[in-house]
């Protein structure tokens, strides 16, 4: 039965994708905040 390894691999892949997306989103948000802050100063 080869199901568990494949499902685990897929889960890790999805998890890594989600983390990567979240990090990119966070960096973009941070850049936006920095720009806004610089504009106010």
Curated annotation (Swiss-Prot):
Urotensin is found in the teleost caudal neurosecretory system. It has a suggested role in osmoregulation and as a corticotropin-releasing factor. Its main location: secreted. PROSITE patterns: CRF. Pfam families: CRF (PF00473). GO terms for cellular component: extracellular region. The modification Valine amide is found at residue 41. Transmembrane segments: none annotated. This is Urotensin-1. It comes from Catostomus commersonii. InterPro entries: Corticotropin-releasing_fac_CS, CRF, Urocortin_CRF. Gene3D superfamilies: 6.10.250.1920. Belongs to the sauvagine/corticotropin-releasing factor/urotensin I family. It is found in: Secreted. Keywords: Amidation, Hormone, Secreted. GO terms for molecular function: hormone activity.
